[in-house]
A protein has these predicted regions:
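Hydrophobic secretory-pathway targeting helix
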Residues: 1-37
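Juxtamembrane interface at the cytosolic side of transmembrane helices
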Residues: 2-13, 118-169, 223-247
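Aromatic-rich transmembrane-lumenal/periplasmic boundary elements in polytopic membrane proteins
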Residues: 24-67
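Hydrophobic alpha-helical transmembrane segments
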Residues: 53-64, 87-95, 152-169
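Short, non-transmembrane cytosolic segments of multipass membrane proteins
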Residues: 59-81
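Individual transmembrane alpha-helix segments
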Residues: 73-117, 201-216
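Juxtamembrane non-transmembrane "cap" segments at the membrane-aqueous interface
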Residues: 166-194
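Terminal transmembrane helical module of multi-pass membrane proteins
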Residues: 184-241
Length: 247
C-alpha cells in the first residue's frame, strides 16, 4: 500500500507540472495571435518608452500610421495561427518575413505541446483515480503530491526571478533567441526593419508578464477540470470496488 501511495503522489506531482507546462505553452501561443500586441499595445509602448506626446510622433518613430499598423497587426496575428502563412506583407522585408515564419513555427509547436501536456495530465488524472481508489488516506496523498508539484514550480519560478535580477531581461531574451532559433534573423536593424521599431524590448517585457498571468489563469482552470475528472472517475471506481467487496 505504501508503494501505491508513493506512485499516486508522484503521479499527482507530475500532473501538476504537465498542467503548468501546458498552460504556459498555451498562453504564449495564444498571445502571439493577439493583434493588439502588434497594434495598439505596440504603439502605446513606443509612445511611453520614447517619451512621445502624440500619435503623429509615434507614427514617425515606427514608420507606420495607426491604420496601416493595425492592418499589419491583424495579418501578423492571423498568420501566427496558420502553417501556410508566408508573411509576404508590406512593408516587411525578406529577413522580417523569414523571422516571422520562424516565430510562427515555434508558436505552432508550443500550441501542439500545450495540447499534449493537457492530454497527458487528463490521462494521469484518470490513472490517479484508479491508483488512489483503495487508499485509506487518498486525499492526503493527493495533496502531498500536488504540494510537491507546486513546490517544484515555485522553485523554477524563483530561479527565473533570480536570473532576471542577476542577468537582466535583455540578456535572457537574447539567450532565448539563440537557443530557440538556428539563425540570426532575429537580430534586426531599426534603420531598415519596421518590426524592431514596432516591438521594442519593453513590449516583450510586458508581453512576458501578460503571458505569465494568462498561464496562471489557464493553469487554475485546467486544475479545476483535472480535480473534477479525478473526483468523478475516482468516485465511480470506489463505488464499483465497494460493490465488489459487498458481493
Amino acid at each position: 500500500m505504501s508503494r501505491l501511495k508513493g506512485i499516486t503522489g508522484l503521479l499527482a506531482a507530475l500532473t501538476v507540472v504537465l498542467a503548468a507546462a501546458g498552460a504556459l505553452c498555451g498562453a504564449v501561443s495564444g498571445l502571439s495571435r493577439d493583434a493588439s500586441l502588434y497594434g495598439t499595445r505596440s504603439r502605446e509602448t513606443v509612445r511611453e518608452t520614447m517619451g512621445l506626446s502624440s500619435q503623429e510622433e509615434v507614427t514617425a518613430a515606427i514608420g507606420l500610421d495607426a491604420q496601416a499598423q493595425e492592418a499589419l497587426a491583424q495579418q501578423i496575428a492571423e498568420g501566427m495561427g496558420r502553417a501556410d502563412a508566408d508573411f509576404a506583407l508590406e512593408p516587411l522585408n525578406a529577413r522580417e518575413q523569414a523571422h516571422l515564419r520562424d516565430v510562427r513555427d515555434l508558436m505552432l509547436r508550443l500550441g501542439s505541446a500545450s495540447k499534449v501536456c493537457f492530454s497527458l495530465a487528463a490521462a494521469l488524472a484518470v490513472v490517479i483515480a484508479w491508483t488512489g481508489a483503495r487508499l485509506t488516506k487518498r486525499r492526503k496523498t493527493l495533496l502531498l503530491g500536488v504540494a510537491a508539484g507546486l513546490g517544484a514550480l515555485l522553485a523554477l519560478s524563483l530561479l527565473l526571478v533570480a536570473l532576471l535580477r542577476g542577468q537582466g531581461f535583455a540578456r535572457l531574451f537574447a539567450g532565448a533567441h539563440e537557443l530557440l532559433f538556428s539563425n540570426d534573423l532575429w537580430l534586426m536593424n531599426p534603420e531598415t526593419d519596421v518590426l524592431i521599431r514596432m516591438m521594442p524590448q519593453a513590449l516583450f517585457e510586458r508581453a512576458a508578464a501578460d503571458a505569465a498571468l494568462g498561464a496562471l489563469r489557464l493553469f487554475a482552470a485546467v486544475g479545476a477540470l483535472l480535480i473534477a475528472i479525478e473526483g468523478l472517475v475516482g468516485g465511480m471506481i470506489r463505488r464499483h470496488l465497494a460493490e465488489e467487496d459487498k458481493a
